[in-house]
Amino acid sequence: HVAQWGTYVTAEEVSKNSARLKIRTSLQYDVEMQTEDSVQQADGTYVVFDSEIIPLIDVVLQSRLVDADGHVVGEAVSEAQLMPVAPAEMEQEIELKNPNLWSIDAPYMYKVESILKNKETGEVLDRYYTPTGIRTFRFDAQKGFILNGEQVKINGVCMHHDLGCLGAAVNTRAIERQLEILKEMGCNGIRCSHNPPAPELLDLCDRMGFIVMDETFDMWRKKKTRHDYSRYFNEWHERDLTDLIVRDRNHPSIFMWSIGNEVLEQWTDAKADTLSLAEANLVLNFGHSADMLAKDGEMSVNSLLTKKLADMVRKLDATR
């Protein structure tokens, strides 16, 4: 099956005349097993888990680009062999002529339909849909924000995850109503605060034509309140930031990531930091590699932590 948030669709070489879409898909083959320690591959047709023989599966991945009217406008087909435990990473490309570009005034949406089939039997094993939009953007020192080659003034607001008297539980129509009111007053940009937003909000921003700054943390290691996220930051920040980027990176509305809201570390002098060198290396090495980031006489722990989080984002999404 396609892994959770297992597709990553990017548009390259985009113009009004053509676009090249790159589709990265992560496939998984899940089996029930006691342990993952005794894995032995035999002759290329099966693997052995604790003496249990599990056959490998040859699959065909068909990725179809579907326009807003339901017409298939591009397709790519690839084959792979799936093995338990180890995901298969596939990369495909689709060339599209005369694409409809996503913009604030005309938020045109495509979707990628990923159809995974058993190569031998033709059985459909999974069908996965990824909404996507095709656009380019950049920042210019003189002109500001440029979307699809045109200057756009960002009229943005900070939108907290609540719905007034309705509370924080997600109500899609209530969110849509909020956005409709904001649209009427001339708003075209949303800053999520100060935590991963509801997917329903991002879907609506895609369809209604808002640009979004997607935000993760309200605090890092240093607490603002007694029971806030700082209690869990060291253990969970890598997983939580990774999940946010991988979950949300296909949304055309997102043009910027935020890795922290008014985090106390940005005002802390290096001498005032209480993290030991050993603790710093545990926190700062993404993936816990042997390479040491924090060293005596270099940047403060806070500067290194900022760099680490920014590097994580760029590694997971190089398009923003």
Predicted segments, located by residue:
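Secreted/periplasmic carbohydrate-active enzymes, especially glycoside hydrolases
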Residues: 1-199, 204, 208-212, 240-243, ...
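Substrate-binding/catalytic cleft of secreted carbohydrate-active enzymes
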Residues: 179-180, 189-320
